[in-house]
Amino acid sequence: RGLEDLSMILCDIGNSTVDCYQEGKVWTLSHAQFKDFSTKERVYYICVNEELLSYLKHRGSYVDLEPYFDFDTIYQGLGVDRIAACCTINDGMIVDAGSAITVDIMSSGVHLGGFILPGLEAYAKAYRSISPRLDMPINPSIALDALPQRTNDAISYGVVKPLILMLEATCKDKRIFFTGGDGKFFSKYFTNAFFD
């Protein structure tokens, strides 16, 4: 076989988007764009979206990686996206800040457990459902060292500060690995953080 036969695409299919990787290049597709995506290469994927998972079962050149993970944990219902992330580190805390914020702790290669929080957009949606006057985006530059003096900052502070405090209390001195659409946003609050 020639080297061109070894080309492949890796995809992480989340609840909101599909992140793809091929030969050092990374790109993001919407679910609709992914359904229209066409390639001659084999596509290896992990998927947490049930609709796309059903769709991909009938695509011959697409390979679901979930059955190939051998991950020992007592956690019930751990998603393949979290399993894949946990398999990449031996010690530390993994924070996938996407549609939901998932947090998992690894110690000496053992999964100690984790928790799930709403993602930033879910918090914003909750505020919108309370009142149209609270329909404001979460401000990623919110100062956390002083109490807010306007509604937009108060909303952002009320979302970001408790999340940061919870992550700090959980990670203690562990390294923190951030991923997901809002991972870069959260990583700036920690000196022991890595974003990928």
What feature does the model see in each segment?
Residues 57-89:
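Glycine/small-residue-rich loop that forms an oxyanion/phosphate-binding "nest" at active or ligand-binding sites
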Residues 50-56, 184-187:
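Short, charged/polar "capping" segments at the starts of alpha-helices
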Residues 1-7:
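Short, Lys/Arg-enriched N-terminal segments with co-localized hydrophobic residues
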Residues 7-24, 89-110, 127:
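Gly/Thr-rich phosphate-binding beta-strand-loop-beta motif of the actin/hexokinase/Hsp70
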Residues 143-175, 182-185, 192-193:
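Adenine-nucleotide phosphate-binding core of ATP-dependent small-molecule kinases
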Residues 84-91, 112-157:
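Glycine-rich phosphate-binding loop plus the immediately following alpha-helix
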Residues 40-49, 174-182:
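Short glycine-rich phosphate-binding loop at a beta-alpha junction
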Residues 24-38:
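A short, well-structured beta->alpha microelement
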